[in-house]
Curated annotation (Swiss-Prot):
Keywords: Acetylation, Heme, Iron, Metal-binding, Oxygen transport, Transport. It comes from Paramecium caudatum. This is Group 1 truncated hemoglobin trHbN. Belongs to the truncated hemoglobin family. Group I subfamily. Monomer.
């Protein structure tokens, strides 16, 4: 069974992604990366990316992550903070600890594409 299925499918990933961005927007250390961004659209794009990355349907049509983040100046510390917000959203949704860590491990695979400083 895929991580996508274990998490509860599309609706669960969408809900976790919405909470993930709520957590980010409440954190001044990373919220500024999303100033002026259409957050409902961003949430949908990220949920589609996560669905595909977690073994679900591949409806993600976003741009290359390395290109998107090239000029953002994201540090390792900021990426770690964002991963913490993902972990918190998953935990808050009642996801089992082992599944949280497996999901975080998938998210960690893009660190090299997102971190630029």
């Amino acid at each position: 069974m895929s991580l996508f299925e274990q998490l509860g499918g599309q609706a669960a990933v969408q809900a976790v992604t919405a909470q993930f961005y709520a957590n980010i927007q409440a954190d001044a250390t990373v919220a500024t990366f999303f100033n002026g961004i259409d957050m409902p659209n961003q949430t949908n794009k990220t949920a589609a990316f996560l669905c595909a990355a977690l073994g679900g349907p591949n409806a993600w049509t976003g741009r290359n992550l390395k290109e998107v983040h090239a000029n953002m100046g994201v540090s390792n510390a900021q990426f770690t903070t964002v991963i913490g917000h993902l972990r918190s959203a998953l935990t808050g949704a009642g996801v089992a600890a082992a599944l949280v860590e497996q999901t975080v491990a998938v998210a960690e695979t893009v660190r090299g594409d997102v971190v630029t400083v």
